[in-house]
Amino acid sequence: MGLERAFADEPAFVPYLAAGDPNYEASLEYVEALARGGADVIELGLPFSEPIAEGKTIQNAIVRSLEAGMTPDRFFQFVEDLDVDVPLVCMTYYNLIYQYGEGDSESRSDSENASGETASQGPRPFVEKAAAVGIEGLVVPDLPGEEAGPLRTACDEFDLDLVFIVAPTTKGDRLERMLEQVSGYVYVQARLGVTGAREDVDDATEDSLARLSDWDVPKAVGFGIKTGAHAERIVSAGADGIIVGSALVDIVAEGHENGDSTDAVADRLEAKARELKEGALRGAAERPQPERT
């Protein structure tokens, strides 16, 4: 398990796009543009018909992807077809993970894994396939830490990281259970507070980072980051990385609605990626430097 390596030397830029939005071929180009623009890890959304944890922008992207024919097996082919040299993470929902393989005769077997589940049940077939095509981690927004045992076991077996989303309200025992099982990085869900022309980090974001400070895992902040200035402020406040989805999905949606060429949209995505990565690097330079002894 090695997503932590993306955070080792500098703040990581982690963009998100829904795989297959607005169509298979264009989406390949868009993901590759993000890699050229400086992405350190790329989160690929595997669409699910009931994306309860997503905002309107990403819900619309998921609808476009589903209408274009995206399925789990097509998603895995998509990953294999990508020409990128950065770690890939799959973001999807547990029902889809759990049900994968039920209709695949090659996945059905009377054999059992160490937990006693048959190979045709539970998350194991999905995790095995994800690892085989090159996915290095999973983000599962609807999976509570206390119910993550079977997925954690499968991820351990196939060397995948399991990333949890920590909201400002995630505290106490629930937070402890998540952090005991997380690997790769923590997705810290937070918002930017904007007052007039001044973009700043709200108290909830700083509180979340402070609560996680004793845990030796990278903290990547997402939710509401749209500009290089946002990225700069988040990293200067102590984040190890930034996660950006809606701002990038908006570029895809606008290009699709306007009938822009794939190349034009890819160029805009690459430029936005560079802006965000450069903002994160500026934020790292602004952090207080430890005193030399």
Swiss-Prot record:
Family: Belongs to the TrpA family.
NCBIfam families listed in its UniProt record: trpA
Alphabetical UniProt keywords: Amino-acid biosynthesis, Aromatic amino acid biosynthesis, Lyase, Tryptophan biosynthesis
Region of interest: Disordered: 103-123
EC number annotated for this UniProt entry: 4.2.1.20
GO CC terms in record: cytosol
Protein name (Swiss-Prot/TrEMBL): Tryptophan synthase alpha chain
Enzyme class: lyase
Gene Ontology MF terms in the entry: tryptophan synthase activity
SUPFAM superfamilies: Ribulose-phoshate binding barrel
Record text on subunit structure and interactions: Tetramer of two alpha and two beta chains.
Pathway(s) per entry: Amino-acid biosynthesis; L-tryptophan biosynthesis; L-tryptophan from chorismate: step 5/5
Role played: The alpha subunit is responsible for the aldol cleavage of indoleglycerol phosphate to indole and glyceraldehyde 3-phosphate.
Active site: E43 (proton acceptor), E54 (proton acceptor)
SS bond list: none
Record field: catalytic activity: (1S,2R)-1-C-(indol-3-yl)glycerol 3-phosphate + L-serine = D-glyceraldehyde 3-phosphate + L-tryptophan + H2O
Encoding gene, per UniProt annotation: trpA
Matching PANTHER family: TRYPTOPHAN SYNTHASE ALPHA CHAIN, CHLOROPLASTIC, TRYPTOPHAN SYNTHASE, ALPHA CHAIN
Pfam families assigned: Trp_syntA
Gene3D superfamilies named in the record: Aldolase class I
